[in-house]
Amino acid sequence: MITQQIPHATTISALRTRVRSWREDRLSVGFVPTMGALHDGHVSLVRLAKAQCDRVVASVFVNPKQFAPGEDLDAYPRTLIDDAEKLTDAKCDLIYLPTPEAMYPDGYSAGVTLKGPALGLESAIRPHFFDGVATVVTKLFNQVRPDMAFFGEKDYQQLLVIRQLVKDLDFPINVLAGETGRDRDGLALSSRNAYLDSDQRTRAGQLNLILKAFAAALSGGASTSDATATALAAASDAFDAVDYVEARCAATLAELGDGPIDRPVRVLAAVRLGSTRLIDNMAANPPA
């Protein structure tokens, strides 16, 4: 467990006491929810929050509700001491460490389900996932009650799901997005990258190149169907398995027609190397 010298709360009451004191001083509150195993992408979100808000809360909670049986809940990396040091270095004002028992006590029965941007893509592969995300984020928003919440663009579908959640449930929260953090070869930073062996790590960098080419083809006037087929073929050659490679409307994640794009879109992919799943996305704009 982290030391008392690092400001943290493990109970809802302790969290609310600290946040209430900030509110009494008329300080704005930013919130960065995480599942731990923090990397530079998470740290950049905390720094973005610090630039926008007077005080920042970051949570570390591996949410069991968004893992299906057989997924990597037990294997998911847990590096709390290192996480606390990174958050402290980034000037996070409070680390919130709820327990599964506190979040989902005996008899817990509520859940949140969304449609709209939650349909397809990740949901087609992991149908439980966004229900778990929406439920835990709703609880965390009610517990922290921030003015702003910060999410990374790497999980683009999740970002749009959270924005829809805030809109539909009337949360008075501004959701801000941080750019995707990347390694030198363009691989999107992810806690699950730690699962990759050296050969897989080398191969993983191809995802960035495939999506860049996909976005460039669409922006250059290629038809959506042709550009998608080319990107899908490249991903199928590069990776052990492909869950999806698609172009969707950037604002809603609605499916597109077969022709050239006429609006901002997002190209999104999920692939596998061994048992490790990689996701990424990029923006593409219609030809000028």
Swiss-Prot record:
Pathway: Cofactor biosynthesis; (R)-pantothenate biosynthesis; (R)-pantothenate from (R)-pantoate and beta-alanine: step 1/1. Keywords: ATP-binding, Cytoplasm, Ligase, Nucleotide-binding, Pantothenate biosynthesis. Its EC number is 6.3.2.1. It holds the Pfam family Pantoate_ligase. It catalyses: (R)-pantoate + beta-alanine + ATP = (R)-pantothenate + AMP + diphosphate + H(+). One of its GO terms (biological process) is pantothenate biosynthetic process. (R)-pantoate binds at residues 66, 158. The keyword Metal-binding does not apply. The active site is at 42 (proton donor). GO terms for cellular component: cytosol. One of its GO terms (molecular function) is pantoate-beta-alanine ligase activity. ATP binds at residues 35-42, 152-155, 181, 189-192. The keyword Signal does not apply. It is an enzyme of class 6 (ligase). Belongs to the pantothenate synthetase family. Homodimer. Catalyzes the condensation of pantoate with beta-alanine in an ATP-dependent reaction via a pantoyl-adenylate intermediate. The reaction proceeds by a bi uni uni bi ping pong mechanism. This is Pantothenate synthetase. It comes from Maricaulis maris (strain MCS10) (Caulobacter maris). The lineage of its organism: Bacteria, Pseudomonadati, Pseudomonadota, Alphaproteobacteria, Maricaulales.
